[in-house]
Amino acid sequence: MTTQVVNVIGAGLAGSEAAYQIAKRGVQVRLYEMRPVRQTPAHHTDKFAELVCSNSLRANTLTNAVGVIKEEMRLMDSVIIRAADECSVPAGGALAVDRHEFAAKVTEYVKNHPNVTVMNEEITDIPEGPTIIATGPLTSPDLSAKLKELTGEDYFYFYDAAAPIVEKDSIDMNKVYLKSRYDKGEAAYLNCPMTEEEFDRFYEALIAAETVPLKEFEKEIFFEGCMPVEVMASRGRQTLVFGPMKPVGLEDPKTGKTPYAVVQLRQDDAAGTLYNIVGFQTHLKWGPQKEVLQLIPGLENAEIVRYGVMHRNTFINSPNLLRPTYQYKQRDDLFFAGQMTGVEGYVESAASGLLAGINAARLVQGEEPVVLPPVTAMGSMANYITATNAKNFQPMNANFGLFAPLEKKIKKKAERNEAYAARALETIRNFVNI
């Protein structure tokens, strides 16, 4: 057994999972958690893995990517998924938990492991030696300053401003056209043209749609030069037509005329299966958001794989900074995990902690860190956050659009998703003993 100790900073979902995975591999862990010595604006207890928003870990079925990632984690002995299964409450096809029982169970499993030493103190600098940083979206100001210093100001962010992303297969290609503004460069955008009547209908729905209430500590984010589309719209109809929906230079090749307004979609992944809606960062609730977006010509039946969000979220530019092992490129023994890496969601955060923990343990034991292939859900997330376009990087949930394409094209969505799941689980079984 190695005498080296791994520092894990943060006992949220990712940090708790990472600590457990390291400890069960015979490596000593120092798990640092500043609560209750210093609380965050969102937490209320001193328990590990406290769920601060919903009590749902989302879909549990294998026809959904987050269901697949859960099953992969079960096979890899995830402490988070084990605790969730033990504390589950009725939720249809989803996995929801009694949040207090869940946090208590995770705390018990991790804290009581003989290889884990818990340190209730705030870390304000990045430690020497093997370390996993899993401090989450509300990282303390002092540590944030050190991380900003480490990564560089251009690669460290304090809030999400993510536009919605849709599956290409769900776009009505008969209503859109491929073109770049003024035909500059290659035709890179799918354009959804609107008549004045269609724009008016869209505009009225947008300004009437219900938004997510801002938390006190989020109120400054809209003044950082990234305005929600509904806030722009509230300043008058023409704000959008002269802003993100401006039609100039985007003549419709079918009519030869310039539409009244245009919504542009930009390819979001290397495989070309996902498109984001340019300039549509939003604070709308998800139900109204879907209704508004489906008023856009060509998106009437759009499958939204990530909804637009704007909220406080400390994260790094992982494509520039991390390897798919969750290692920092400039320092082999420094790992990042959780929402800080750009994975979005409870389960995805825990999954990143699982892989970072395994790799930290392997590193101190003299073994090569593992890269999970992108045919798996966990591997596809690691691949996305480290290989996607760094310039437009924003956090992402697990979805089948991130998986490596199937060898054989399957038209029916349910059958296609089943094939993704079967391939992922067959592959992950080769890694259960790492």
From Swiss-Prot:
<keyword id="KW-0285">Flavoprotein</keyword>
<keyword id="KW-0521">NADP</keyword>
<comment type="function">
    <text>Catalyzes the folate-dependent formation of 5-methyl-uridine at position 54 (M-5-U54) in all tRNAs.</text>
</comment>
<dbReference type="GO" id="GO:0047151">
    <property type="term" value="F:tRNA (uracil(54)-C5)-methyltransferase activity, 5,10-methylenetetrahydrofolate-dependent"/>
</dbReference>
<keyword id="KW-0520">NAD</keyword>
<protein>
    <recommendedName>
        <fullName>Methylenetetrahydrofolate--tRNA-(uracil-5-)-methyltransferase TrmFO</fullName>
        <ecNumber>2.1.1.74</ecNumber>
    </recommendedName>
</protein>
<dbReference type="GO" id="GO:0050660">
    <property type="term" value="F:flavin adenine dinucleotide binding"/>
</dbReference>
<dbReference type="InterPro" id="IPR004417">
    <property type="entry name" value="TrmFO"/>
</dbReference>
<keyword id="KW-0489">Methyltransferase</keyword>
<keyword id="KW-0963">Cytoplasm</keyword>
<dbReference type="InterPro" id="IPR020595">
    <property type="entry name" value="MnmG-rel_CS"/>
</dbReference>
<dbReference type="GO" id="GO:0002098">
    <property type="term" value="P:tRNA wobble uridine modification"/>
</dbReference>
<dbReference type="Pfam" id="PF01134">
    <property type="entry name" value="GIDA"/>
</dbReference>
<dbReference type="GO" id="GO:0005829">
    <property type="term" value="C:cytosol"/>
</dbReference>
<dbReference type="InterPro" id="IPR002218">
    <property type="entry name" value="MnmG-rel"/>
</dbReference>
<dbReference type="InterPro" id="IPR036188">
    <property type="entry name" value="FAD/NAD-bd_sf"/>
</dbReference>
<comment type="similarity">
    <text>Belongs to the MnmG family. TrmFO subfamily.</text>
</comment>
<dbReference type="InterPro" id="IPR040131">
    <property type="entry name" value="MnmG_N"/>
</dbReference>
<dbReference type="GO" id="GO:0030488">
    <property type="term" value="P:tRNA methylation"/>
</dbReference>
<keyword id="KW-0808">Transferase</keyword>
<keyword id="KW-0819">tRNA processing</keyword>
<keyword id="KW-0274">FAD</keyword>
<feature type="binding site">
    <location>
        <begin position="10"/>
        <end position="15"/>
    </location>
    <ligand>
        <name>FAD</name>
    </ligand>
</feature>
